[in-house]
Amino acid sequence: MATLNPLSWVTWLAENEDKLRPPVNNYCLYQGNDFILMAVGGPNERNDYHVNETEVRLQWHQPSETNEQEWFYQVQGDMLLRVIENDTFRDIPIKEGEMFLLPGNTPHNPVRYKDTIGLVMERQRPAESRDRLRWYCTKGNHCSPTIIREEVFHCADLGSQLKPIIERWQQDEESRRCGECGCIADPK
C-alpha cells in the first residue's frame, strides 16, 4: 500500500508556480481511477469553449440530468466562467472562496485573471469519450451561437493536449473565419 501524506498547498504553489502558465495554465495534481484534480492559474490566453462529453444519465433527480459535472473552486482571486446555456452565451462570475458545479456537456470557457488560482475536478474520461474544443463567432450578427471551428479528441492529459490545439487556432487566421458571416475571430 502506498504511503499517504497531506499536500502543503502553500509549499506546492511556491515550488510550482511556473507550471500554471498560458495558454492553458493547468497542472494535474492528482489523477486516479475515477477523477482528476487540477490546479489552474491566471491569466489564461484562450477563447475556446471546452465540451466534456463523458455523460452518464442519472435515474434519480431528473432524467435529463447527468452526473458528469466539472467542479470549480476559486482559491485566490475571481474568475469568469463563460458558458452556452439554452443556446445563449452566459457569464458566471466565480468569486474567491466560491465553488461552482458545471453540468456535464456544457460548452464552457474559463476566463482566469492575473494572479488567480483555482482548483478544477473532473471525471476520468472513458476510452470511447470525446472532448471538444469549439470556437464561436462573436463578431457577426448571429441569432444563436455559431461554431467557427471544432476539434474533437480523446483527452488523456488536458494540460498537454489543449496547448497545441489552441496554438494552431491562434496561428492560423483562415481557420478563424466564420463560414456564415466571413468575420475573422480574434486569436485569443
From Swiss-Prot:
Cofactor(s) listed: Fe(2+)
UniProt main location, coarse: cytoplasm
Physiological role: Catalyzes the oxidative ring opening of 3-hydroxyanthranilate to 2-amino-3-carboxymuconate semialdehyde, which spontaneously cyclizes to quinolinate.
UniProt keywords, alphabetically: Cytoplasm, Dioxygenase, Iron, Metal-binding, Oxidoreductase, Pyridine nucleotide biosynthesis
Protein name: 3-hydroxyanthranilate 3,4-dioxygenase 2
Natural source organism: Aspergillus fumigatus (strain ATCC MYA-4609 / CBS 101355 / FGSC A1100 / Af293)
Residues holding Fe cation: H50, E70, H108
Family to which the UniProt record says this protein belongs: Belongs to the 3-HAO family.
